[in-house]
Amino acid sequence: MRVFFYVQHLLGIGHLKRAAILAHALREAGFHVTLVSGGAPMPGIDVDVQLPPASAADLTFKTLLDDAGQLVDDAWKRRRAAALLDVWRASRADVLAVELFPFGRRQMRFELLPLLEDATRLAPRPLVVCSVRDVIQSRPEREAETVALARRYFDHVLVHGDPRLAAFDRSFGAAASLEGRLHYTGYVVANAVSPSDGAAEVLVSAGGGAVGVRLLESAMLAREHTLLRGATWRVLAGLNCSEADFRALQRHVKPGIALERSREDFAALLANCALSISQAGYNTVAETLQARVRAVLVPFAAGGESEQTLRAQLLAERGAAMMLDESALTVENLAEAVNRAARAPRPPADLVDLDGARRTAELIGEFWSAKNQPPAAPSARGPLYRGPKR
């Protein structure tokens, strides 16, 4: 079975990373996957088709830039939409998976609506699924339109979360309108890494690094005020951290603090750390829960973003992490949060379902089989037969 998987990351790398994990799980289950990315290429993440990349100009996500940093125009959009349709038609896919839309990525409607319309017109029509994270940016004024688009174009909506922690209606109030289409998969995370012996470090990270330098700087300054000041603090700035910001962070490096851009063995570092300090992006949180490490979460909240704040609040309510609002981020407050987290127990192993990648592949297989199951043969006695008369 052939799966065409579309993903567009605009600022961070979380969407692309999750899509790559899902693509790997689908291949492990025997699917032939074409992973199509519309964002900037990322080292260490392989895709099958790279469209002309687009990124967000700022935290509002309303303006798109091309790979030269120029505003995209209508001609660029037409070329990109045509390129996407070309690779879609060439794939002859049985399943179309679209990441986030219609729950986000409205700025990509210029290419997604033609893609979905094309899929709708095909005979036989492919299975069409939406892949969406546990919590989305809440936009109540757009929910009716989102439901209409989901009903028109999508057979199923796969929510990569666990309702025991975050029911989808916590961020999308009209979730009940999609009853029958909406399915929870559990959290999507790569295979677990077993902890190894060694000095336990404090791991400080900010995802891809496009935002979060203030958190990293605050952590470097907070170290000496914490119970964990004797440990090495490893700070990962991220591949998207600007050169200017990285140089500014280097000024705070001292014995006991290691600063790097990224590590391919991030999962192993996390599994072995004494404590994690991070934002509350989907992938980092899922990996933190998988590793069962003590954590301080400082959710990204600039530009009116609410997704990470809700996720961090839900985890803090369960005692799985300490939360510090970005607006309250100071060296003193962060040090206090680190000390509270250091004294706290580790998160429970059964807090959430972390088998989302495998379950997604399983569900897509089930949906495809049900869609293509031949109709039952009619009864020999005719459709109105009700059984023998008494």
Please describe what each predicted stretch is:
Residues 1-12, 98-100:
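Nucleotide-activated donor-dependent transferases that construct or modify glycoconjugates
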Residues 3-6, 25-75, 79-81, 86:
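Conserved nucleotide-sugar phosphate-binding/catalytic loop shared by glycosyltransferases and other
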Residues 7-20, 212-213:
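A short, glycine/small-residue-rich beta-strand->loop->alpha-helix junction that serves as a flexible
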Residues 23, 172-174, 187-275, 309, ...:
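Donor-nucleotide binding loops and adjacent catalytic segments primarily
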Residues 39-40, 265-309:
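A donor-sugar binding/catalytic signature common to diverse glycosyltransferases
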Residues 110-184:
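Active-site-proximal region of nucleotide-activated glycan assembly enzymes
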Residues 336, 340-390:
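C-terminal amphipathic helix plus adjacent low-complexity
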